[in-house]
Every structure is written in structure tokens, then in C-alpha cells.
Amino acid sequence: MDTKQAVLDILNELTGEDLSDQMDENIFENGLLDSMATVQMLLELQDKCGVTAPVSEFHREDWDTPNKIIAKVESLRNE
């Protein structure tokens, strides 16, 4: 599964929303993810995408849209 689809699947599971046509929507400002869902998202990304993003190094502005999450996951994969 490619990164984009994996991220969209995870976000769909957590928010109940199909965000594929809202790739630049701020998921925090729109109330789609709260702090608990954010931790769950990071755990799911670790499990499904093989990347580790510690909560202590999580900066919301770097992860606030589906496109930014995809870019961050791809960046972490390339480290």
C-alpha cells in the first residue's frame, strides 16, 4: 500500500471522514483529531508505515493536513 493510501485509511478510521478530497484541510482546526486521536494516528503510522514519530517530537503545524502527514511519513521513511 502506498503512503498516501495508508495515511488516508488511518485518518478515515480515526475521523470517520473521507479526506481524499480535502488534502489541505487542517484536521486539528476542524476538530477532526484531538490529542488522543493524534497519539493513535502516530501509533497507526508506526504500525502500517514503519515510521517512528515520537509524541515528544510531534509539532502540530508539521502534521496538520493530510498532505503534510504524507510528506512527513515519506521524509521519516527516507531517514
UniProtKB/Swiss-Prot annotation:
<comment type="function">
    <text>Carrier protein involved in the D-alanylation of lipoteichoic acid (LTA). The loading of thioester-linked D-alanine onto DltC is catalyzed by D-alanine--D-alanyl carrier protein ligase DltA. The DltC-carried D-alanyl group is further transferred to cell membrane phosphatidylglycerol (PG) by forming an ester bond, probably catalyzed by DltD. D-alanylation of LTA plays an important role in modulating the properties of the cell wall in Gram-positive bacteria, influencing the net charge of the cell wall.</text>
</comment>
<comment type="similarity">
    <text>Belongs to the DltC family.</text>
</comment>
<dbReference type="GO" id="GO:0036370">
    <property type="term" value="F:D-alanyl carrier activity"/>
</dbReference>
<keyword id="KW-0597">Phosphoprotein</keyword>
<dbReference type="GO" id="GO:0070395">
    <property type="term" value="P:lipoteichoic acid biosynthetic process"/>
</dbReference>
<feature type="modified residue" description="O-(pantetheine 4'-phosphoryl)serine">
    <location>
        <position position="35"/>
    </location>
</feature>
<protein>
    <recommendedName>
        <fullName>D-alanyl carrier protein</fullName>
    </recommendedName>
</protein>
<keyword id="KW-0596">Phosphopantetheine</keyword>
<keyword id="KW-0963">Cytoplasm</keyword>
<comment type="pathway">
    <text>Cell wall biogenesis; lipoteichoic acid biosynthesis.</text>
</comment>
<dbReference type="GO" id="GO:0071555">
    <property type="term" value="P:cell wall organization"/>
</dbReference>
<dbReference type="InterPro" id="IPR003230">
    <property type="entry name" value="DltC"/>
</dbReference>
<dbReference type="GO" id="GO:0005737">
    <property type="term" value="C:cytoplasm"/>
</dbReference>
<dbReference type="InterPro" id="IPR036736">
    <property type="entry name" value="ACP-like_sf"/>
</dbReference>
<dbReference type="InterPro" id="IPR009081">
    <property type="entry name" value="PP-bd_ACP"/>
</dbReference>
<keyword id="KW-0961">Cell wall biogenesis/degradation</keyword>
<feature type="domain" description="Carrier">
    <location>
        <begin position="1"/>
        <end position="77"/>
    </location>
</feature>
<dbReference type="Pfam" id="PF00550">
    <property type="entry name" value="PP-binding"/>
</dbReference>
